[in-house]
């Protein structure tokens, strides 16, 4: 038997957790995610957005939303750009662990759409220019995973 999630979201409800830090990037990721959800038939009224101060706060809010069982998927969007200190490494590691743990405590898929880049140019490329829009990619993953879990 094969299981495969469909890419139609007409009956899905999706939450997006987005960081306000580096909002010149995260706003593009959010636009890409919302546009993609709508293009895949998720009703705009079924898309809720929670804003958090920075990437570090994303996992807690994502976990809380996923545990509510009101959503078929939760998308996390943020942007961490390497600076001149080790802060980048700590934030990236803890955010990735936190999002992963959120998947462990609920049956709602929590999708990792957080950019971790070496510089601003890489972030811009992944927010809608050369390398596509990682927010849009996260939205496709959310739809597929939500439908796959319904099928299993």
Curated annotation (Swiss-Prot):
The active site is at 87 (proton donor). GO terms for biological process: riboflavin biosynthetic process. The keyword Transferase applies. Pfam families: DMRL_synthase. Its EC number is 2.5.1.78. The keyword Transferase applies. (2S)-2-hydroxy-3-oxobutyl phosphate binds at residues 84-85, 126. Belongs to the DMRL synthase family. This is 6,7-dimethyl-8-ribityllumazine synthase. It comes from Staphylococcus saprophyticus subsp. saprophyticus (strain ATCC 15305 / DSM 20229 / NCIMB 8711 / NCTC 7292 / S-41).
């Amino acid at each position: 038997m094969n299981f495969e999630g469909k890419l139609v979201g007409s009956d899905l409800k999706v939450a997006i957790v987005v960081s306000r830090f580096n909002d010149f990037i995260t706003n593009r990721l959010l636009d890409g995610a919302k546009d993609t959800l709508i293009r895949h038939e998720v009703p705009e009224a079924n898309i809720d957005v929670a804003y958090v101060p920075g990437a570090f706060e994303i996992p807690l809010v994502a976990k809380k939303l996923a545990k509510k069982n009101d959503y078929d998927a939760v998308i996390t969007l943020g942007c961490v750009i390497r600076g001149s200190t080790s802060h980048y490494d700590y934030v990236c590691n803890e955010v990735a662990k936190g999002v992963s743990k959120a998947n462990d405590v609920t049956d709602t898929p929590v999708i990792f759409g957080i950019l971790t880049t070496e510089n601003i140019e890489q972030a811009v490329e992944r927010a809608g220019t050369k390398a596509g829009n990682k927010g849009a990619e996260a939205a496709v993953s959310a739809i597929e995973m939500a439908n796959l879990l319904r099928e299993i």
